Amino acid sequence: MEDSNNEASDDFNNLLNKEIESAKEVKLRKFANRNNNRNENSSKVKDASGFRLRVIQTDGHKTKKTDPDYEVTIDGPLRKIEPYFFTYKTFCKERWRDRKLVDVFVSEFRDREPSYYSKTIAEGKVYLNDEPANLDTIIRDGDLITHKVHRHEPPVTSKPIDIVFEDEDILVIDKPSSIPVHPTGRYRFNTITKMLERQLGYSVHPCNRLDKPTSGLMFLAKTPLGADRMGDQMKAREVTKEYVARVKGEFPIGIVEVDKPVRSVNPKVALNAVCEMSDENAKHAKTVFQRVSYDGQTSIVKCKPLTGRTHQIRVHLQYLGFPIANDPIYSNPDIWGPDLGRGGLQNYDDIVLKLDAIGKTNPAESWIHPHSEGEYLLGRQCEECEAEMYTDPGTNDLDLWLHAFRYESLERNSDTQKPLWSYRTKYPEWALEPHRRYMEMAVKEAGKCGPTKTAFSVGAVLVHGTQVLATGYSRELPGNTHAEQCALIKYSQLHPNCPTIVPMGTVLYTTMEPCSFRLSGNEPCCDRILATQGAIGTVFVGVMEPDTFVKNNTSLNKLESHGVNYIQIPGYEEECTIIAFKGHDNSDDKA
């Protein structure tokens, strides 16, 4: 078994290395040709930022076409677009050549029923090279198809798009769940690129893609230079990616690797699955998982994809038997049965049929949110265009517990040896929610500290799964002890034979950032955490330590460099700081 596992790993590494080398060759060729093509491209039609425009994106004066006016309504958790008219233009794609126009519309544009396209084309409302088409029209290479439609866009979340970083070339954002990256299918103005264009007043171009339901870090280019710089790094695998997921059940402690290939089963219902490399359209894939915490029902899991296949993380988690708990595709018991597709299936025909009904006759469901309201057909049509009308999306449509948390360059600064760049978002609320009760417990512990003129008051809680192992607060034990120190001592006194001080998978909650230096010469709390030999794998803090404690506290970098997850839970900063300064002169001003 070990030999076969090693062979599979070697096969994956060989395939990945070939992919990386190919991407690097493309990057070098692009760089070499950039100056050569500068004069050649000067005659190309471009937008204000220098991006080339396709012919169908321009008007007769070779300037960028403007979008039609549209009205946005914020309705509680939903961002809605009022129906509007839009003229859709596209040139014949290679796969459309020598096919009937009506057949192409039916197979490619699935947001309408076949009868709608037949009727629309028969009435002469679709044009081919500016001439009305009919049901017998055949599409040829170079043909321009024009179709004016009355569009009904599905609502998306009304959560704002937060900007993480911006310079003259790139924009880094925290993408909310439920919003497509760019215009596609039924979506145009309820997309990231169009929303940002409306918000910023200029166009941006995606450097990486996130699925519609996935939230988190996205890179968008403001200039062609930014697009090349970031896009080439992504393709050449010069970037590490870290996602956060909330999955069903108690995920194992330790590192879990999955290197099963992935394939598309049915793009119409967005179904993908694990497979063998011998299967048609199989693509090598590998994801590394590590548990962050377990709350008795679900686990927070750190996910590091080494490849970027569609639904890779979701499919690999399902394969392990720990699907994302609110995943409407891969965690729906009515579709997959009690095992939820663990280990993969031999045949997916029944799954495809059931998924095809989602959003039509049945709303989306998931393991954590069964029988919830969601989008489905209302059974009535628009009076203007006869399009089928839908209900508003629900919980399973608007949020997926999968978040792109951190992207980091693999290249290092030659002087500091730190990554050339590193971006992260705030931790998503759905990943923090199970931990708030323990942080509130730590705050109560901090409140037990007596007032002092110079020392600081902190509370700490050690948790394993749902079991509270020990609590502590500053100076609870003799010797100018810190809260984390007290909790660890109290647990070790009750369990003197534990080889790692606390059980593997223990989580520490502390109201203040653990200290990395003790003026008293006592062992810093950061070092005490590392002394557990990985048993404490995650630290949640209420507030980062201010410089008035110890300047340049390096706990965050030190713990993360040793593989410890370090996460702040927002909402407790003021309370934790007020308690910390209890008894100090002018404590209110310091807080």
UniProtKB/Swiss-Prot annotation:
Entry keywords, A to Z: Cytoplasm, Hydrolase, Isomerase, Metal-binding, Riboflavin biosynthesis, RNA-binding, tRNA processing, Zinc
Residue span(s) of domain CMP/dCMP-type deaminase: 433-552
A single GO molecular function term of this UniProt record: pseudouridine synthase activity
Binding residues annotated for Zn(2+), in chain numbering: 482, 515, 525
Pathway(s) where this gene product acts: Cofactor biosynthesis; riboflavin biosynthesis; 5-amino-6-(D-ribitylamino)uracil from GTP: step 2/4
GO biological process, one term: tRNA pseudouridine synthesis
EC number of the protein: 5.4.99.28, 3.5.4.26
DRAP deaminase as annotated region, ranges: 433-591
Family matches, as Pfam families: Inv-AAD, PseudoU_synth_2
Catalytic residues, chain numbering: 211, 484 (proton donor)
SUPFAM superfamilies per UniProt: Cytidine deaminase-like, Pseudouridine synthase
Cofactor-binding details, from the entry: Binds 1 zinc ion.
Matching InterPro entries: CMP_dCMP_dom, Cytidine_deaminase-like, PsdUridine_synth_cat_dom_sf, PsdUridine_synth_RluA-like_CS, PsdUridine_synth_RluC/D, PsdUridine_synth_RsuA/RluA, RluA_PseudoU_synthase
Catalytic activity annotation: uridine(32) in tRNA = pseudouridine(32) in tRNA; 2,5-diamino-6-hydroxy-4-(5-phosphoribosylamino)-pyrimidine + H2O + H(+) = 5-amino-6-(5-phospho-D-ribosylamino)uracil + NH4(+)
Function comment: Responsible for synthesis of pseudouridine from uracil-32 in cytoplasmic transfer RNAs. Involved in riboflavin biosynthesis. Converts 2,5-diamino-6-(ribosylamino)-4(3H)-pyrimidinone 5'-phosphate into 5-amino-6-(ribosylamino)-2,4(1H,3H)-pyrimidinedione 5'-phosphate.
Family named by the database record: In the N-terminal section; belongs to the pseudouridine synthase RluA family. In the C-terminal section; belongs to the cytidine and deoxycytidylate deaminase family.
Record's protein name: Bifunctional protein RIB2
Source organism of the structure: Saccharomyces cerevisiae (strain ATCC 204508 / S288c)
Gene of this entry: RIB2
